[in-house]
Amino acid sequence: MSTYLIGDVHGCFDELKSLLAQVAFDPQQDQLWLTGDLVARGPGSLDVLRYVRSLGPAVRMVLGNHDLHLLAVYAGISRNKPKDRITPLLEAPDADELINWLRRQPVLQVDEQLKLVMAHAGITPQWDIETAQLCAREVEAVLSSDSYPLFLDAMYGDMPNNWSPELSGLARLRFSTNALTRMRYCFPNGQLDMICKDAPGTAPAPLKPWFELPRLVDADYTIIFGHWASLEGRGTPAGVIGLDTGCCWGGDLTMLRWEDQQYFTQPANRRDLLDGVHQQAAS
């Protein structure tokens, strides 16, 4: 059995299948971890969801900000943007089944045996592992409930951007969602900055990538994340691994086999690229 971790797929179905073929992935024996943002931007969001769902317990995934946006579009809360290329998914005969499956997926994965923690954007330096798990469970509970459209309608927004155990209600859920699915930069005290999307090294002072601040998550855990394509999988400290390498922008789809720490990549299909080149900061 092998554990494979893959960065943001973003609807790049052909690349996903080709990448898994490189290692003869066997869902009967192997486990596949996905950093979220399965959908949008690439041409095959519908096929990606159908395939990942078909893998059943062989998959451990987390939701990303684009996955949440898809839920909001399907619920009539947000508008469908042509650049997301999700219309075939929205109009599919099995759309209801796929959406209801998707909204019941977690926003955080923790494996105590492998000592792996995975969230789409990472783990805010203001959280220890117990707080991250608690806040993730709260988001997951509302997403899987009948009142999930109310949450989706309220999740958009950048405030509050500073963690406090006293946060409650929709404000607490919004902070948790932003920390788990949208975070990139923080102020030195750990407060989230939800504005800057610049590549590392070009962000204005005093902002720092979240992973450069002291962490409260125990050092025994490795944090796996996606979301930040302009990192190109580089520049993170020991114990933090970024796997989004911008496949939908012309980069690669990247996979890590955990047991031997071997990386595999699959280049983007040039014919499937979005108009424009490397707009990674917008992802």
Curated annotation (Swiss-Prot):
GO molecular function: bis(5'-nucleosyl)-tetraphosphatase (symmetrical) activity
Annotated CDD domains: MPP_ApaH (cd07422)
Entry keyword ATP-binding: no
Disulphide bridges: none
Record bears the keyword Hydrolase: yes
Catalysed reactions, as listed in the record: P(1),P(4)-bis(5'-adenosyl) tetraphosphate + H2O = 2 ADP + 2 H(+)
UniProt keyword annotations, A-Z: Hydrolase
Enzyme class: hydrolase
EC number in record: 3.6.1.41
Function of the protein: Hydrolyzes diadenosine 5',5'''-P1,P4-tetraphosphate to yield ADP.
NCBIfam families tied to this protein: apaH, PRK00166.1
Family that this chain belongs to: Belongs to the Ap4A hydrolase family.
The protein's name in its UniProt record: Bis(5'-nucleosyl)-tetraphosphatase, symmetrical
